Curated annotation (Swiss-Prot):
Gene encoding the protein: ubiB
Organism: Escherichia coli (strain K12)
GO molecular function, one term: protein kinase activity
Record's protein name: Probable protein kinase UbiB
EC number: 2.7.-.-
Primary role: Is probably a protein kinase regulator of UbiI activity which is involved in aerobic coenzyme Q (ubiquinone) biosynthesis.
Mutant phenotype after disruption: Cells lacking this gene fail to produce coenzyme Q8, and accumulate octaprenylphenol (OPP).
Amino acid sequence: MTPGEVRRLYFIIRTFLSYGLDELIPKMRITLPLRLWRYSLFWMPNRHKDKLLGERLRLALQELGPVWIKFGQMLSTRRDLFPPHIADQLALLQDKVAPFDGKLAKQQIEAAMGGLPVEAWFDDFEIKPLASASIAQVHTARLKSNGKEVVIKVIRPDILPVIKADLKLIYRLARWVPRLLPDGRRLRPTEVVREYEKTLIDELNLLRESANAIQLRRNFEDSPMLYIPEVYPDYCSEGMMVMERIYGIPVSDVAALEKNGTNMKLLAERGVQVFFTQVFRDSFFHADMHPGNIFVSYEHPENPKYIGIDCGIVGSLNKEDKRYLAENFIAFFNRDYRKVAELHVDSGWVPPDTNVEEFEFAIRTVCEPIFEKPLAEISFGHVLLNLFNTARRFNMEVQPQLVLLQKTLLYVEGVGRQLYPQLDLWKTAKPFLESWIKDQVGIPALVRAFKEKAPFWVEKMPELPELVYDSLRQGKYLQHSVDKIARELQSNHVRQGQSRYFLGIGATLVLSGTFLLVSRPEWGLMPGWLMAGGLIAWFVGWRKTR
């Protein structure tokens, strides 16, 4: 370790101990040296004994800085790792830090714009930041070219070395978890950190965020539900992003929304509709929809529209994941736990050899008590959470896209019920889910699939005669080979008459599999199965000749 890493590690240890987080060290024989070492650091007592463990953990992470704050935010969505009282505290972590010097931001902007002064591109540049977070901060200005108000987002200087150093330490801690906790291996701590690292590094590239914002804006162009500010790509780079400045009411300011005459029920329902539209229609969803990133337009309060910013984190689901997710929700609310278990196996979320009966019983045990509440009070996010936590006991692999989805759904629900406590998520979402599933089957779906594949077949059509000729020629050669092998087998004197049958079948299957492997690679595993069956049959025939 470098001297800098040693100093940072000392600061982390001192911070953890000053908040009494040594309580998290399990009392096991393997941890005895660690606990004895802690007792030797008697001059670092717990200075916050009046606070509960969850709050102390949150405060410690806030003190350690941006990397640890964001790590805590991510861990708050993994409630299989922590009990609820700790996970709830982690969810309160705020990504707010002191701004860096505006002059440094100005220098970075000038460097990104080819060394020209800020005044060459922008008017009214405000040296004082409008907002500041752990990764970047925002300044206001006007475009010189058209006079439009914009915000300029700038990455914090020299943050990458800090992030890499802290991530290295977090990886080391993660490698200790399987040794210290009996259930540590199942929790896959290294995968959790790797997932976090990818998310964090992605946030450092503002070109990625620019592309995400442009895509979301295109998806909701002319939509009455959501507005994404315009991005000006000519001014964007990895370390800087320029987009339209928006004016709106923070979605968390319920009093201001009510004062503006906002239709709160419609606003809450539209939040749910926006989320499910992103997931199921677009397969591309804003995955950081906490209240700080959502505003409501001042205009048309009777027909309210959301404004979304900060598109650094997005998620996507493939067609299979979307179908299984929609069917899971519907099966759950129909209390069809057998269907839920089968869907998890069919989707590949749990291993194929999972005992479906045991899995169904586990899901029923965890989920049935949820229905003690009125349907309107049931949380979609917690439904997913319970299902995933149960599935992890059956070796469910970590699904990063589903973790993002569940976190976002919790945000959407929290905002919706803050706006309108009587919000019935199931009533709002059920028609959408049923309509989407219906749209995936039947004649319209077949027509759509044909349209998607039509260009491929049009391209291949001129090659069809040649492909047919090649197939017939290879088929004739195959038949000749099979006949030759069969004649050779018949000439042999075998002790058991059945051996010829097995050897012939084996040869046919092997050659058929070889032929298909060469001429029809798109058939997937079928040639392999034919060849494997042929080898087995051949082996049986050979055994019968002995």
